[in-house]
Design a protein with these regions (language model features):
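Exposed, low-structure sequence patches enriched in small/polar residues
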Residues: 2-216
Length: 216
């Protein structure tokens, strides 16, 4: 084995101001016999800075944060870039709300796709008996087709409910919907995999998951 893995980070967490910087690298020939490596040939750098105000009333704390990251391969080609601005509110009763705006670049089949996305979400966990939450994301997304990749529009919604009526029993329900459309008419029937309807919809997927466990 001749490959290598490098990971370095610095973090500072204060009462109001927090920041972090990190970098890691996975060489193209990195292998391991004791685990699975999702991706090699990667150099990544990222950073985060956030600030919090603490009214400590019905609004416990709130504040903005900024995240930025870049991924290069070992040929110095930029493959991914992401910048995110987020605003987070934490309320009494273990309730959280966030809004975020993303600017991203994703490289696929030698093409750089520039994306703009928006998201809003939150959760309520004011009781040990349950937790409910969800999010909504929308914006540009890549249609990953080897023959004709293009930039379309995606909306995704997720709602979940966790129930814990007794200490030994837990139940979780997830409802997910993802809808992808081609507003610019770039889908080519016969060349692209899949179909597109008269409204430009390429797919609309609904997934419902339920899992219950009881510990004896």
């Amino acid at each position: 084995k001749t490959g290598y893995f490098l990971d370095a980070s610095f973090r500072k967490t204060g009462r109001r101001l927090s920041y972090r910087a990190s970098t890691y690298a996975l060489s193209p020939d990195f292998e391991t016999d004791v685990g699975f490596v999702r991706r090699t040939n990667l150099r990544r750098g990222s950073g985060n800075i956030g600030y919090e105000w603490r009214p400590e009333s019905w609004l416990v704390n709130w504040g903005p944060s900024i995240d930025y990251s870049r991924n290069y391969n070992f040929d110095q080609i930029l493959e991914d870039e992401q910048a995110q601005a987020r605003l987070t509110f934490v309320f009494r009763g273990n309730t959280r709300l966030y809004l975020n705006s993303n600017r991203e670049m994703e490289r696929f089949r030698g093409i750089d796709f520039e994306k703009r996305r928006f998201g809003v979400g939150g959760r309520v966990a004011s009781s040990r008996l349950y937790q409910v939450g969800g999010y909504y994301n929308s914006g540009d997304e890549v249609y990953f087709d080897n023959a004709n990749p293009f930039l379309g529009y995606e909306e995704s919604v997720r709602l979940y409910l966790n129930l814990n009526p007794v200490s030994r029993f837990q139940s979780r329900i997830d409802v997910n919907n993802t809808r992808f459309t081609d507003p610019n008419g770039r889908f080519i029937p016969g060349l692209n995999e899949g179909d597109v309807d008269e409204n430009g919809q390429v797919f609309n997927v609904n997934i419902v998951r339920a899992l219950s466990t009881y510990q004896f």
